[in-house]
């Protein structure tokens, strides 16, 4: 995963001023815990205690479907209790909002994006970005899909659809 994905998550805070909680379940990197590498846990140890070289310290890995927080050893055995989702309701809501926006029904589309944002504790778009044009709303949808669906094998289809 690239660092720009992390930066997408850091563009907004929740309604109570905290970092987007989806970041911690999507990415594993030196500051997955916002307090830094001394608090970021990797298989039961802190990121700092691993003594990774600089090449490793600067990387970002996918955390979705990883069971590192259920285990305390160094080995991934891929027996996580986390179900693999083929399609998520959040994806359906965002696709529907995109379709409405494509039909120039941008005002109607807000409510579907807001359902996804509410689960993450983010403020409604009508509050933080009211009156967006069709193009602005599309750009916001692209951000929403990155922060909600990264690591779920949907990005290629998004890019192909957006041109």
Region spans (language model):
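Acidic/polar-rich alpha-helix caps and helix-coil junctions
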Residues: 1, 13-163
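Beta-sandwich/jelly-roll carbohydrate-recognition scaffolds of carbohydrate-active enzymes
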Residues: 7-10
